[in-house]
Swiss-Prot record:
Main subcellular location: membrane
Function of the protein: Polymerizes chitin, a structural polymer of the cell wall and septum, by transferring the sugar moiety of UDP-GlcNAc to the non-reducing end of the growing chitin polymer.
Polar residues bias: start-end ranges: 15-24
Major enzyme class: transferase
Topology relative to the membrane: Multi-pass membrane protein
Biased composition (Pro residues): 52-68, 76-89
Name of the protein described by the UniProt record: Chitin synthase 2
Compositionally biased spans, kind Basic and acidic residues: 1-12
Transmembrane annotation, as ranges: 500-517, 540-560, 586-606, 621-641, 665-685, 799-819, 825-845
Length: 858
């Protein structure tokens, strides 16, 4: 018999044996010995082996003589090609090719049934809840270093039948409080249908970070047993949506077993399946298994929550924050999207920021675009442009906002929050309350502004943290922490992603500016509140600038290309690249192409999905890039000619050169902008994107303004996440149940009229009904149709306001008959260029201050 062990954490028994035996299913009392003495071990399925470990040697005792189909052999597997080892050295057993068989079939092998023999047991409910302690496979346990302790020998399954907010009050608990452990880091990995490679990339990266925490033996918090203070929570959005190969990786980690979960418990439908286990293995993206004790792998406490239904990412965060958070009571919560790979020490650096400054409520690291092996992904101009965009945001934008203390968005792909700061007040009002409003007000009965705003609910959470009543929390950027993620490499995916980003950020930005007074109800110092006001002014200017970006970009193109011809005011360059008539012809042709492209964007955005218009959108981006090349040529030529003219007329005096509008507006403003890009990149010791991605970003910048903005604004009515559907079954027509008749065939019972008088009565009723005169009914729209009409009418009004305001700006500047001011085109071009330069100076100043503060605060 098995030796007597410690008492279980609760009055519970395993759901079933892990041994395969010839014993028939029997009913057992919970007070009988669950493991009979005469039942031998016969589970010889090997665990995936690691290159660092030789294959496990399994016992060679023969199977029971009455085991069905058991051959009289002494080895678990017959030798193949005179190789007695069941697996090839250094190669995981699951990936070794099987010996050829005369009965070989081709194609994908069918999925193995989870159990061939099951034992039915009586299981006591724990406080009315189904909780099962299931032994892990013996093959797994034989291949790991730690074999004692229930967290290593048993996987704990809980069938949750409650809403996340009722998890603790309904009597559910988790292993950490039962083991008396204090959790310092609670890491959540949100998942939908990502494949096994993306999941392993993230999970293996997290486990490498946990291993790094265990190497910090001089820390007061961490050390060799630091893994006991970290819990990794994996939340998968929908049981029918999860990738099956990802489930196989989870099963390999020991945290998932097939055939355990149940749909209904005591008449209540299960809302989430919760699996808990402390794994001792890790699977890297190459599907190689690393065991505890090897490099970068230590035990890891995993909490796997498999939601029964697909209910969006924000609902996954409800399970993390509302259900599991209060039970575990962590210090810091880290949010990571599956597919994002954290750097080897990134989680430690995030945690250290909270440890140094007790006023930090949230922090984020750098989000990097995956460039592939030796940067091969940057050969795709779409990836390169996004790489440049991400880099400059992390070098200029995030440091500036961190200096102010308010970061407009902590990216959900890789960020961290202090659990204490997230909590609501005694009345239930606070950051989490506003954050989770997005689940009920997104779509549903929400107004269109709120629905779009909650497309970027993480921005709402950031503002609510900073403006929390009677608190003084700030947000911080940690440049030494980073997470790598895949970016869209196809035009249709890129446009669809940016639609939600642009609409969510626009409406969330309006929300933050509209509620600027909330900051004055916080407990921040007067200086900090004034800094927030300065940041609000900066954000307001950016918001207005982005609203008129469509008109501003066209005006810049119009004025610069017109200057190579006869000019907006009729003047010509002193040294043009070609004759004024040729320049005027080129300007006219390119101008018409620009206008046609804009019209095409509106037509496609209002009626086509990007997935159905890939060629059209790709072609549009190519044409806009060609227009950008001509515009840059015009800008460079005007700059060179302007410098020569100014030097000749001013005698080389810099003061006199500054008095020339051409020199000021074009040369100084543009050079200042791009020089600051280079200088700031070198200051952060990360300049390579300026050489590998800058040109691609410049060429695609017209598409950012014209393609992405138009598609986003024209689809503000679309606030769906694509996860809702009709999952109910109508029963108004009756339910047909099949039964076997006397001959053993299936038959059904249905109710149909058979009496002649009933049939005739129905016929007469139909005749009478047609003789009646009815009043014409007024058509009524149902609630869903009314909401869709309201959303579309809002979209129409918004797009009209956007088009009219930008068109009015273009007409006022480009048409001399509307406003006849001498040199107005040059004046407005100077305003645009100096605005860009001024915003760049502010960002550069903030970036420099961030580096200075980092020297003293770490």
């Amino acid at each position: 018999m098995y030796p007597e062990g410690p008492k279980p954490e609760h009055d519970q028994f395993p759901l079933q044996d892990t041994q395969f035996s010839n014993q028939p299913p029997v009913h057992r009392s919970p007070f009988e010995d669950p493991y009979p003495e005469d039942q031998p071990h016969f589970d010889k399925q090997p665990l995936l082996t690691s290159p660092a470990y030789p294959p496990t040697q399994y016992p060679t005792s023969p199977p029971p003589p009455n085991f069905p189909g058991s051959p009289a052999v002494q080895q678990p597997y017959p030798p193949f090609n005179n190789n007695p080892s069941p697996v090839s050295p250094g190669v995981p057993a699951y990936f070794n090719p099987a010996p050829p068989s005369p009965n070989m079939h081709y194609g994908q092998a069918p999925r193995r049934q989870p159990r061939r023999f099951k034992t039915t047991r009586q299981v006591k409910l724990t406080k009315g809840n189904l909780v099962l302690d299931c032994p892990v496979p013996t093959a797994y346990l034989n291949d790991v270093p730690i074999k004692d302790g229930k967290e290593f020998t048993h996987m704990r399954y809980t069938a949750a039948t409650c809403d996340p907010k009722d998890f603790a009050s309904d009597g559910y608990t988790l292993r950490q409080p039962m083991l008396g452990r204090k959790t310092e880091l609670f890491i959540v990995l949100t998942m939908y249908n990502e494949d096994e490679v993306l999941f392993a990339r993230t999970m293996h990266g997290v486990m490498k970070n946990i291993a790094h925490l265990c190497t910090r033996d001089r820390s007061r918090t961490w050390g060799p047993n630091g893994w006991e203070k970290v819990v990794v929570c994996i939340v998968s959005d929908g049981r029918n949506k999860i990738n099956q190969r990802t489930l196989s990786v989870l099963a390999l980690l020991g945290v998932y077993q097939d055939g355990i979960a149940k749909n209904v418990v005591h008449g209540k439908p299960v809302t989430a399946h919760i699996y808990e286990y402390t794994t001792q293995v890790s699977v890297d993206p190459n599907m190689e298994v690393k065991k505890a004790g090897s490099k970068n792998v230590v035990p890891c406490q995993i909490l796997f929550c498999l939601k029964e239904k697909n209910q969006k990412k924000i609902n996954s965060h409800r399970w993390f924050f509302q259900a599991f958070g209060p039970v575990i009571d962590p210090h810091i919560c880290v949010l990571i999207d599956v597919g994002t790979k954290p750097g080897g020490t990134s989680i430690y650096h995030l945690w250290k920021a909270f440890d140094i400054n007790s006023n930090i409520a949230g922090a984020c690291g750098e989000i990097r675009a995956m460039a592939g092996t030796r940067g091969v992904a940057l050969l795709n101009p779409l990836v390169a442009a996004q790489n440049f965009e991400y880099k400059m945001s992390n070098i200029l934008d995030k440091p500036l906002e961190s200096v102010f203390g308010y970061i407009s968005v902590l990216p959900g792909a890789f960020s961290a929050y202090r659990f204490k700061a997230l909590q609501n007040d005694v009345n239930g009002h606070g950051p989490l309350e506003k954050y989770f409003l997005g689940e009920t007000q997104h779509g549903g009965d929400a107004d269109i502004f709120t629905a779009n705003m909650y497309l970027a609910e993480d921005r709402i959470l950031c503002y609510e943290l900073v403006a929390k009543k009677e608190a003084h929390w700030v947000l911080h950027y940690v440049s030494s922490s980073y997470g790598e993620t895949d970016v869209p490499d196809k035009v249709d995916e890129f446009i669809s992603q940016r639609r939600r980003w642009l609409n969510g950020s626009f409406f969330a930005g309006v929300y933050a500016l509209y509620h600027w007074r909330k900051v004055w109800q916080s407990d921040h110092s007067y200086l900090r509140k004034m800094m927030f006001m300065v940041e609000d002014i900066y954000n307001t200017y950016n918001l207005i600038f982005s609203w008129f970006a469509l008109g501003n970009f066209y005006l810049t193109f119009f004025i610069l290309t017109k200057a190579l011809g006869h000019g907006v005011d009729g003047s010509t360059l002193t040294d043009p690249p070609f004759s004024p008539d040729t320049g005027e012809t080129l300007h006219t042709v390119f101008n018409y192409i620009y206008i046609v492209l804009i019209v095409i964007q509106f037509i496609m955005a209002l009626g086509n999905r990007p997935q159905g218009s890939k060629i059209a959108y790709t072609s549009s981006m190519v044409f806009f890039a060609i227009l950008m090349v001509y515009m840059m040529f015009a800008a460079i030529w005007i700059t060179v000619v302007g410098v020569k003219t100014v030097v000749e007329t001013s005698g080389g005096q810099f003061i006199e050169m500054l008095e020339q509008s051409t020199f000021r507006n074009i040369i100084i403003s543009l050079c200042a902008t791009y020089v600051m890009y280079f200088v700031s990149s070198f200051m952060f010791l990360d300049p390579w994107h300026m050489f590998t991605s800058f040109i691609q970003y410049i060429l695609l910048s017209p598409s950012y303004t014209n393609v992405l903005n138009i598609y986003a604004f024209c689809n503000t009515h679309d606030v769906s996440w694509g996860t809702k559907g009709d999952n109910t079954v109508a029963t108004d027509l009756g339910v047909v149940k099949a039964k076997k008749d006397g001959s053993g065939d299936l038959a059904v019972e249905v109710e149909v009229p058979v009496e002649e008088k009933d049939i005739n009565a129905a016929f007469i009723d139909a005749q009478v009904e047609l003789t009646k005169k009815i009043e014409p009914e007024k058509s009524h729209r149902d609630a869903k149709t009314k909401q869709e009409d309201y959303y579309r009418s809002f979209r129409t009004r918004l797009v009209l306001a956007w088009i009219i305001s930008n068109l009015a700006l273009v007409v006022a500047i480009a048409n001399t008959t509307v406003i006849d001011i001498k040199g107005k085109a040059s004046i407005y071009l100077g305003f645009i260029l100096w605005s860009v330069a001024g915003l760049s100076v502010i960002r550069f100043t903030g970036s420099t201050l961030y580096l200075i503060f980092k020297i003293f605060t770490g």
